[in-house]
Amino acid sequence: MQDVVIIDDTEINLILFSALIKKLDNCRSHNFESPIQALDWAATKQPDLVIVDYMMPGMDGLEFIQRFRALEGCQEVPILMITANDQKQVRYRALDSGANDFLAKPVDKVEFLARAKNMLSLSAARRKLADRAEWLDSEVKKATAVI
């Protein structure tokens, strides 16, 4: 099961994005109105995808990304930033801060699902590579112990 964290201070957006994620095979969403709550959750579990709003009270999406990327194991987790502000400067700042992709509101459902699905595929491939590297490392250690 792939875990998708959704962070948005607007409840209707959480409901919409969560319903869309449920359409994807083998996915479940973890919804948070507060970036702080999402960080607390992510500190103990590593999500496969994060969907975060750009503008939120208390902590914006940019600050969330910086804090999230500082968590152990979260440097490579794909992040999709969503905002009502579609100015190029906002996009650049979002991508420069560590977001992997960007969508402007109102979000096209088909495009949202396609981007989320692509990012989840990348996340699954990354995990498989990490597992394979760990296995190879253990095999090398076993082989060198014999020598």
Annotate the PLM regions.
Residues 124-146:
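Amphipathic alpha-helical coiled-coil "transmission" helices that mediate dimerization
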Residues 19, 63, 75, 86-101:
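Alpha4 helix (beta4-alpha4-beta5 surface) of REC/receiver domains from two-component response regulators
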Residues 45-52:
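Active-site beta3 strand of CheY-like receiver
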Residues 57, 105:
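A Lys-centered signature of the CheY-like receiver
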Residues 107-116, 120:
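C-terminal output helix
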Residues 11-30:
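Two-component/phosphorelay signaling modules centered on CheY-like receiver
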Residues 8, 53, 83:
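Active-site residues of response regulator receiver
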Residues 33-34, 60-66:
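Acidic catalytic/metal-coordinating carboxylates
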